[in-house]
Amino acid sequence: MARILGIDIPNQKRIEIALTYIFGIGLSRSQAILKQANINPDKRVKDLTEEEFVAIRNVASAYKIEGDLRREIALNIKHLSEIGAWRGLRHRKNLPVRGQRTRTNARTRKGPRKTVANKKIESK
């Protein structure tokens, strides 16, 4: 396993795919990083030289990734919650934020079903 910016990336994969193991770097950003660093995206991680690793590190360090990105996302959610925004309220209640229905569905966000027993009807 090679390390880039403190993250272990797999040796056997193409560098274009391996960079996506870093939080905040998807396929398109990984392609942009490799283009700026002048590295062939089809090259395997195990075949990279130390100079190429340094070039990738220099280009990738300009982006907000891993801990910094996670911190920024958490602060944005906290800010929404503090100002009393609807989205902040939905985040606090662990419900869908973007207007999806919740009467049915939304099970991922709400968690497993909590069944409620029916009230028995008294017979006369």
Curated annotation (Swiss-Prot):
One MF annotation (Gene Ontology) recorded for this entry: rRNA binding
Transmembrane listed as a keyword: no
One cellular-component annotation, GO: small ribosomal subunit
Coiled coil (residue ranges): none
Region (Disordered): 94-124
Keyword Lipid metabolism: no
Pfam families cross-referenced by the UniProt entry: Ribosomal_S13
UniProt keywords, alphabetically: Ribonucleoprotein, Ribosomal protein, RNA-binding, rRNA-binding, tRNA-binding
Function, in words: Located at the top of the head of the 30S subunit, it contacts several helices of the 16S rRNA. In the 70S ribosome it contacts the 23S rRNA (bridge B1a) and protein L5 of the 50S subunit (bridge B1b), connecting the 2 subunits; these bridges are implicated in subunit movement. Contacts the tRNAs in the A and P-sites.
Family: Belongs to the universal ribosomal protein uS13 family.
NCBIfam families assigned to the protein according to its UniProt record, in alphabetical order: uS13_bact
Subunit structure: Part of the 30S ribosomal subunit. Forms a loose heterodimer with protein S19. Forms two bridges to the 50S subunit in the 70S ribosome.
Protein name: Small ribosomal subunit protein uS13
Species: Mycoplasma pneumoniae (strain ATCC 29342 / M129 / Subtype 1) (Mycoplasmoides pneumoniae)
Encoding gene, per UniProt annotation: rpsM
